[in-house]
Amino acid sequence: MPKMKTKSSAKKRFRVRPGGTVKRGQAFKRHILTKKTTKNKRHLRGTVAVHETNMGHIAQMLPFAGL
């Protein structure tokens, strides 16, 4: 059986919190920002938790995260 490996892209994009939830950065804040309102850009700051329906995919990509 081959080695289990962590997906490098997931390793860079997700962080596991002590409680077992996973945080991620928000999308739509990289470019084409002139047409977005200041309020919209402000709400895209920071991180949010990954939704429960996606946690199975995250657990497969991060096998050693203990999810």
Swiss-Prot record:
It comes from the Bacteria. PROSITE patterns: RIBOSOMAL_L35. GO terms for cellular component: cytosolic large ribosomal subunit. It comes from Leptothrix cholodnii (strain ATCC 51168 / LMG 8142 / SP-6). This is Large ribosomal subunit protein bL35. InterPro entries: Ribosomal_bL35, Ribosomal_bL35-like, Ribosomal_bL35_CS, Ribosomal_bL35_sf. One of its GO terms (molecular function) is structural constituent of ribosome. The keyword Ribonucleoprotein applies. Keywords: Ribonucleoprotein, Ribosomal protein. Belongs to the bacterial ribosomal protein bL35 family. Gene3D superfamilies: 4.10.410.60. PANTHER family: 54S RIBOSOMAL PROTEIN BL35M, LARGE RIBOSOMAL SUBUNIT PROTEIN BL35M. One of its GO terms (biological process) is translation.
